[in-house]
Amino acid sequence: MNRVYNFSAGPSMLPVSVLQKAQADLLDYHGSGMSVMEMSHRSKWFDEIIQHTEAGIRKVLNVPDNYKIGFFQGGATQQFAMVPLNFMTTGTADYLVTGNFSKKAAEEAAKFGTARIAASSKDKNFTYIPDVKAIAYDPNASYIHICQNNTIFGTTYKDVPQVDGIPLVADMSSMIFSEPTDVSKYGCIYFGVQKNVAPAGMAIAIIRDDLLGKSAKGIPAEKIPTMMNYTTLLDKDSMYNTPPCWCIYMTGLVMDYLQNEVGGLEEMAKINHAKAKVLYDYLDGQDFYNNPVQPEYRSMMNVTFTSPNPDMDKKFCAAATEAGFVNLKGHRLVGGMRASIYNAMPAQGVNDLVDFMEKFRKENA
């Protein structure tokens, strides 16, 4: 088996042991005589799968009992519209814009009310996170929205807004399950699964009970399209229609992996911090590559860097691919390179990448 180190921002690497388990079950899931891909979502087998997956998420994240968990199609991008449709009860919400996806979320929310930009880091090309304690929030805001880890620009929040009476909504697509999270700080957490959880095709939302059953100002709850209505979908246990069955199954396997092989999110965080430290320490210790992010806001999951010029960046990416380090090309908005070192990236992959980077530097400096 000749597997490469895949540094893609998403879809991304999955743990090999999870892939092997899925492979073993592929043709005959637990004596059912069929694949999870083939079985009815109303079958007893799939009922066991979805219950197992939800229980796994609750245990791994320590989700309080007053939160519901939903499995949705449409990815995190669909959540950009679902959040304001369901939660913007006052007609306004505060958005902290720290990158491309929080910008898109604010633009989508503006279709349903006022998406007030309470703070932005655009002035320094999104290389930092605004001080959340120094922001003047709108007391009439229905919620405060953040993208907690910025995949494209390689930044992350070290602290999150906490304002009495205003729920916090967070897109955690590129950092969920990378470290312990105090779910009780949030009204809603949502994430696309294709970065750090499962194959592409699903988003998961964790929503506090008291936020359900509402709607954007001027839009009666019964007028929200059925497949965009959190309450309707959660009342049907995410099975109003056929859910993304395979993604739900794979998410359950990843929850098993995090519990049984890693030992929980505290252990996962130690591993992830160590991996990121290796790469950032190398970047800081030489002058051929540059990481533009202010150190206190650096992402543990997405590490951005450039070489001396765009032509050298292209040469680096081509050489890296040839050497078995794939998908290191940076996002088109920022260029350069990006190493996404999610949970499934082994420490050896980061060590080997650093060795390759040093070899390339010596040959091209």
Describe the predicted segments one by one.
Residues 3-54:
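A glycine-/small-polar-enriched, mobile loop at the entrance of the PLP active site in fold-type I
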Residues 3-4, 322, 331-365:
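PLP-dependent enzyme catalytic core of the Aspartate aminotransferase-like
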Residues 10, 109, 121-176:
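Active-site phosphate-binding strand-loop segment of PLP-dependent enzymes
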Residues 15, 193-280, 294, 363-365:
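Active-site C-terminal subdomain of aminotransferase-like
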Residues 32-79, 86, 100, 108:
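Conserved N-terminal alpha-helix of the aminotransferase class I/II PLP-enzyme fold
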Residues 77-144:
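PLP-dependent aminotransferase-like
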Residues 169, 183-194, 203:
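Conserved active-site segment immediately N-terminal to the catalytic lysine
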Residues 289-319:
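Conserved PLP-binding catalytic core of the aspartate aminotransferase-like
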